[in-house]
UniProtKB/Swiss-Prot annotation:
The lineage of its organism: Eukaryota, Viridiplantae, Streptophyta, Embryophyta, Tracheophyta. GO terms for molecular function: heme binding. Belongs to the CcmF/CycK/Ccl1/NrfE/CcsA family. PANTHER family: CYTOCHROME B_B6 PROTEIN-RELATED, HEME EXPORTER PROTEIN C. This is Cytochrome c biogenesis protein CcsA. The keyword Secreted does not apply. It comes from Agrostis stolonifera (Creeping bentgrass).
Amino acid sequence: MLFATLEHILTHISFSTISIVITIHLITLLVRELGGLRDSSEKGMIVTFFSITGFLVSRWASSGHFPLSNLYESLIFLSWALYILHTIPKIQNSKNDLSTITTPSTILTQGFATSGLLTEMHQSTILVPALQSQWLMMHVSMMLLSYATLLCGSLLSAAILIIRFRNNFHFFSKKKKNVLHKTFLFSDFYAKRSALKSTSVPSFPNYYKYQLTERLDSWSYRVISLGFTLLTIGILCGAVWANEAWGSYWNWDPKETWAFITWTIFAIYLHSRTNQNWKGTNSALVASIGFLIIWICYFGINLLGIGLHSYGSFTLTPK
């Protein structure tokens, strides 16, 4: 009863704080001059992190097992993992471009988990025999940590594509305008002016965007490399556990199949980084596709409730 009450309090604290943080982010998005609100948002993230940590510890103590047995608990753990990623650049005292991805990801994940849509899974239950294994914590935690990491890396790659698409769109629209200008007005003068411009140093906004995309690309590669390693460990742990539980290392279960597809997509991404012709926009496109694949693997298969991993949001125990 004590743990249930504590979990209830911590859940409401995290949800209330997340609601405030979302409001602050919307205000700072619309009114950039209110920079002081950003500090309040960061403090709200810290409160949410400690609330989530307290919830996980309380859930662990009350149930007797690490809280990863259903979709609700896994979403809570996923938001906790996203916050860990959020703090890494701060520890390194580096420019925190990663926070532009991790902050909204943490907010949305935690907000969905505590919104009331998964209320039937809030009550802690005893693990079914299939999940009563020491491999539960190792396998599921590695998979969720890899999902959190790969999602952040994929979103960073998507941000690169958006920035480059906007630059290309601006370039072609400007080029079209220049062609019309040269055709109808001051053609000789404009040609000389363009020649001078071509030999000058790139403008500051373009140079800033170039630096930004390079930083995002570097962060994306490092984050995805870490996530790919965690995913590989998680899949290997799952294979060992599957052999103990079902007598086979691999069964081509829907979850296993999509985990393999996810692994393949990011293996292609990492391989493309070694090829100069594919490095940049092409590799970022592969990683962006991986973002959708991860959500299908993690969320979509659970909701369908099919296969050996059928622990979706509408069922408390595997079939």
